[in-house]
């Protein structure tokens, strides 16, 4: 909802400007994403040079004509009754909860639909199961046939990846970094990042376990 949705909307606006997407409606169906987008629009001083140049030439990428923001639950339910082409951007990204789960439930058996998973999905989540492209999947206790096309787009994560984290830390004074704590992500990925940091000259890297205490 925060970061990734806005990047997707910005990308769609650019694709529309290039004539690669027609005038089909785009719905952002997530109250948090709607509110977060308003925050983005209120703070242009945080935009980079590319974004300022785009605003000058093309206008607001978060407000093009066919873009609609959905906050109310009843409006969200109405989207499931549509039979014309549309793009629905919804959360959560891993499809484990939220409105997106209902959209998948209502459209996964439709061979004319495409479900695109954007970004990382943790093991065991509905999103991770969909990425494996099963022939059937259980949602809300009901076994459904997967007739929709399943696609993935891994380049749009709101989180810094392995190399971006190392690059960020490489700009810090290593002598002043007394300890680095890795507290987010799967253990195997944390261990891989820890090894990458060690290879780049960082020391005292900890992967805390639940209730473990450290003296700082």
Task: List where the protein language model places each region.
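Acidic/His-rich, metal-assisted hydrolase cores and their charged scaffolds
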Residues: 2-216
């Amino acid at each position: 909802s925060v970061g990734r949705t806005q990047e997707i909307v910005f990308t769609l606006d650019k694709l529309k400007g290039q004539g690669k997407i027609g005038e089909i409606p785009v719905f952002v169906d997530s109250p948090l994403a709607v509110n977060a987008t308003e925050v983005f629009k209120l703070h242009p001083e945080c935009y980079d040079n590319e974004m300022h140049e785009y605003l000058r030439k093309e206008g607001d990428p978060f407000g093009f004509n066919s873009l609609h923001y959905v906050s109310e639950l009843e409006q969200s339910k109405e989207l499931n009754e549509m039979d014309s082409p549309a793009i629905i951007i919804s959360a959560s990204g891993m499809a484990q909860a939220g409105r997106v789960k209902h959209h998948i439930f209502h459209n996964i058996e439709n061979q004319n639909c495409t479900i695109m998973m954007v970004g990382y999905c943790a093991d065991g989540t509905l999103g991770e199961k969909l990425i494996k492209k099963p022939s059937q999947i259980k949602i809300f206790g009901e076994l459904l046939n997967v007739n929709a096309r399943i696609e993935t787009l891994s380049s749009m994560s709101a989180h810094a990846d392995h190399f971006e984290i190392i690059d960020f830390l490489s700009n810090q004074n290593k002598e002043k970094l007394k300890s680095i704590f890795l507290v987010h992500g799967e253990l195997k990925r944390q261990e891989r990042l820890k090894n990458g940091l060690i290879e780049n000259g960082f020391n005292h890297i900890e992967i805390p376990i639940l209730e473990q205490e450290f003296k700082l």
